[in-house]
A protein has these predicted regions:
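Extracellular low-complexity Ser/Thr/Asn/Gly-rich intrinsically disordered segments
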Residues: 1-310
Length: 310
């Protein structure tokens, strides 16, 4: 009874005065460094003018840990995302993290670093998630820090139906569409002889189909969509240009009245060609028109002059 106390504080940076008398007051602890700060409080009692033996105790103020997170990440659907490595200048710091949308392929939460994973986005739009990291050291939680991971979708392209036209016919423009905004399109043409360039970007413009051969020409148009730097799956459609068939006729025929004219066969280098014919003068004994080859007929001329039919 009657004792008084004088105390000293070895490190006033913790928020407590360097010295005082009586009990130590309440104070707000402070540590703006990355490491724990330990201060020694030495208390000397005095009674009846006689000093006692000093006694000491310590106050340790642990820092609030700060986490350093990766920069924001942007990847394509199906791409590998590297592990998110978290660091702190405070030794022994641990990390807990949450992910706002596990659909991208990363778990909803975890501890330590965020593991590597395969980015997943099965929608038509970019998906951006927030990864929030909370550091803890010596039982003291730090301020949560967030970074973003964006997984862009794989764009899909819708192409026209296959096109079949005749030689020299104008082909309308082919318009490509995608449900992913901002998609662009690159295309290739397997046979530029049809009148279309070998490659291009955006839509295929209108052109005149060309086929100077005797057989149909089918070109493969391969369209590859891209959006946000991510390529989509190429899609194909076909443009077929049918040739202009050419008929090979027999030699001109001269016959006498009442004689039999043999059948006349027509040919073409284009397979599947059919023939339609007309006769300018049915009086010769041949019908005015028909299909296929000319049939045999009996030549007729009841005049006194030669009759020529075309």
């Amino acid at each position: 009874p009657g004792s008084t106390f004088d105390w000293t504080n070895s490190d006033a940076s913790i928020g407590l005065a360097a010295s005082g008398t009586g009990n130590t007051p309440s104070f707000s602890s402070t540590n703006n460094s990355a490491n724990p700060v330990t201060s020694t409080i030495t208390v000397t009692p005095t009674a009846n003018g006689c000093p006692g033996t000093p006694a000491s105790y310590t106050i340790t103020v642990n820092p609030i840990p700060v986490v350093v997170v990766p920069a924001d990440i942007v990847v394509c659907n199906g791409a590998a995302v590297s592990a998110g490595v978290f660091t702190s200048t405070t030794p022994g710091t641990t990390f807990a993290w949450t992910n706002s949308n596990p659909s991208i392929g990363l778990a909803a939460s975890g501890t330590g670093d965020a593991p590597s994973f395969t980015g997943t986005n099965n929608t038509a739009l970019p998906v951006t998630v927030t990864v929030t990291v909370t550091p803890t050291a010596n039982g003291c939680p730090g301020v949560p820090i967030a970074y973003n991971i964006t997984v862009n979708p794989t764009p899909a392209v819708v192409v026209p139906a296959d096109i079949v036209v005749c030689n020299a016919v104008t082909i309308a423009a082919s318009n490509f569409t995608s449900t992913t905004p901002g998609s662009t399109f690159d295309w290739t043409n397997s046979d530029a002889s049809i009148g279309l360039a070998a490659n291009g970007t955006s839509d295929v413009l209108s052109f005149t189909g060309t086929n100077n051969s005797a057989l149909p020409i089918t070109a493969t148009i391969t369209v590859t969509p891209s959006a946000n730097g991510c390529p989509g799956t190429p899609v194909l459609y076909y443009i077929t240009i049918n040739p202009t068939p050419v008929v090979v006729l027999p030699a001109s025929i001269t016959a006498c009245n009442a004689s039999t004219v043999s059948p006349s066969a027509f040919t073409s280098a284009t397979p599947g060609t059919t023939f339609t014919w007309i006769n300018s003068d049915p009086s010769i004994g041949l019908a005015a028109s028909g299909t296929g080859n000319l049939p045999s007929f009996t030549a007729t001329n009841n005049t006194v002059l030669p009759v020529t039919a075309t």
